[in-house]
Structure formats: structure tokens, C-alpha cells
A protein has these predicted regions:
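Nucleotide/phosphate-binding catalytic cleft detector across ATP-hydrolyzing
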Residues: 1-137, 145-202
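Conserved Rossmann-like nucleotide-cofactor binding loop
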Residues: 140
Length: 202
């Protein structure tokens, strides 16, 4: 998201395709996801960021660089970056995330808890003396939190989220129709059919 232009610059999955032992990143995001299950033995499909933490530092840096070089025309080194992280994440994990973003070329990096970032993105005034329940469904983690007076009052996370839903869709289609679909296809179906409905009542 570019705050100056008020628009989303990159909206893609944190997936990378790497080559050989060097782990050279050759494809990222949707392009990499589409290659899942179709790569040669010399190529690997990796998730360098999982459950809100860094699982492969070098690949995470390579992925971020490719995203930013493609979309920001090499100006990333001149900007300050804000990165959302799960509530309750440890100091070691925080430092790893900061180091990845700095290594990718950012001038400065600030971490913000995911529930706060989600609330701000939804237009909620987080500084009000009111409690707002925020549900953040990521790829590997679903986080539920109460936000009030500019902070997270309480939060709880479970390691089941978007990826699990994708896998459930894949298994359902295979069981019902005996057809195997790609993870990217399952994700598209999830996004199209699983959007929240404003004004829905029970």
C-alpha cells in the first residue's frame, strides 16, 4: 500500500519459486503459486513467511525485492515501511521481519500489530473509547482481537486460516468430482464465494 498515492501496489501471496541449492528466486506471488505442482526437480516452491514469521530469511528478502523492484521502480530505498505482524509475536521474530525489510532496501521499518492495521484499513477510529472486535484471516493464522484507545486490549490466534480453506476446497472438489485443481484455483474460488456480506443479519 502506498500511503502517498492511497492505493494498493502489491496484493499477491508470499510464495516464491527458487532454483537449486543457491535458492535464487525466479518467480514470486501469483506467478509462483500457479507453478505449484508443475515445477522441474531443480525448482522449489517455498513459503518464506508462514504464520506471521520468517521461515527462510534469504528467500524472504529475494521475494520482497522482486515485488518492490517490479512495482516501485527502485525507489524502495527512499521510503519508510510499516509492516503488520501478529499480536504477541516474539522479539526474535520481530527482529527477523525488520531485518528482511531493511535487507530488501527500505530506509526505515515500523511494526504494527495486525488487528490495529486491519482496524485502520477498515476505517475504524482506533483511538475512540470503544471496543471493536477485529477478525484477521491470514494465510496460516486467524487472529481475533479487541481494539480500543489505540491499542490491542486482548487477542487470540489459531493456526488455521486461508491456506486450510484452500486445501479443504481442493479436497472437496477431488472427492465430489474426482478432479484435482490447483491451489491458485481454490484460492480464487474462496475469494469469490467467501466475501463478507455487509448488512447480513441472523
Amino acid at each position: 500500500y502506498n500511503a502517498n498515492e492511497e492505493k494498493i501496489i502489491v496484493d499477491e501471496p508470499t510464495v516464491a519459486v527458487t532454483r537449486g541449492e543457491s535458492r535464487e528466486v525466479i518467480a514470486v506471488g501469483t506467478e509462483a503459486l500457479d507453478m505449484l505442482g508443475k515445477t522441474a526437480d531443480s525448482l522449489s516452491v517455498l513459503n518464506p513467511v508462514k504464520d506471521g514469521g520468517i521461515t527462510n530469511f534469504d528467500v524472504a528478502v529475494g521475494l520482497l525485492k522482486k515485488f518492490l523492484d517490479k512495482n516501485l521502480n527502485n525507489v524502495f530505498s527512499k521510503i519508510r515501511a510499516a509492516v503488520s505482524v501478529p499480536s504477541g509475536i516474539g522479539d526474535v521474530e520481530k527482529r527477523a521481519i525488520e531485518e528482511v525489510v531493511i535487507s530488501a532496501g527500505a530506509k526505515e521499518v515500523y511494526l504494527i500489530e495486525s488487528p490495529l492495521a486491519g482496524a485502520i484499513g477498515a476505517g475504524v477510529d482506533i483511538n475512540e473509547p470503544k471496543g471493536y472486535v477485529i477478525v484477521d484471516v491470514g494465510a496460516g493464522t486467524t487472529e481475533v482481537a479487541v481494539v480500543s484507545l489505540g491499542g490491542v486490549v486482548v487477542s487470540k490466534s489459531v493456526r488455521s486460516a486461508g491456506d486450510a480453506l484452500d486445501n479443504d476446497i481442493i479436497q472437496l472438489i477431488k472427492k465430489k468430482y474426482n478432479v484435482e485443481i490447483a491451489k491458485s484455483t481454490a484460492e480464487k474460488a474462496k475469494i469469490k464465494l467467501g466475501a463478507a456480506m455487509v448488512g447480513l443479519t441472523t
